[in-house]
Amino acid sequence: MGIIAWIIFDLIAGIIAKLIMPGRDGGGFFLTCILGIVGAVVGGWLATMFGIGGSISGFNLHSFLVAVVGAILVLGIFRLLRRE
């Protein structure tokens, strides 16, 4: 059950990133899911690597904000790569 909860957590982060950065990316809901999951993983990895805020674990506001920032970063990179 834990992995499903994390996927839902990351999906919500992806949806919020999409609301913050609206636009037509193609892929629809599926792309939002993938970018949210990848973004949350990237955000958690970067936060841990740079020592931002200590440990990223559990379902809390800090972990969620890191996931949203990671999803925004991945969405921005995705858009830059699609434009070229």
UniProtKB/Swiss-Prot annotation:
Give the stretches traversing the membrane: 1-21, 27-47, 58-78
Give the UniProt family note: Belongs to the UPF0410 family.
Q: Where on the tree of life does the source sit, at the highest rank?
A: Bacteria
Location comes to: Cell inner membrane
Q: What Pfam families does the record point to? A: Transgly_assoc
Annotated signal peptide:
none
Identify its membrane topology class: Multi-pass membrane protein
> What Gene Ontology cellular component terms go with this record?
plasma membrane
Q: What is its main location?
A: membrane
InterPro entries reported in the protein's UniProt record: Transgly_assoc
Query: Which species is this UniProt entry from?
Result: Escherichia coli (strain K12)
The gene from which this protein is expressed is: ymgE
Question: What start-end ranges are recorded for coiled-coil regions in this protein?
Answer: none
Protein name stated in the entry: UPF0410 protein YmgE
Ordered alphabetically, the record's keywords are: Cell inner membrane, Cell membrane, Membrane, Transmembrane, Transmembrane helix
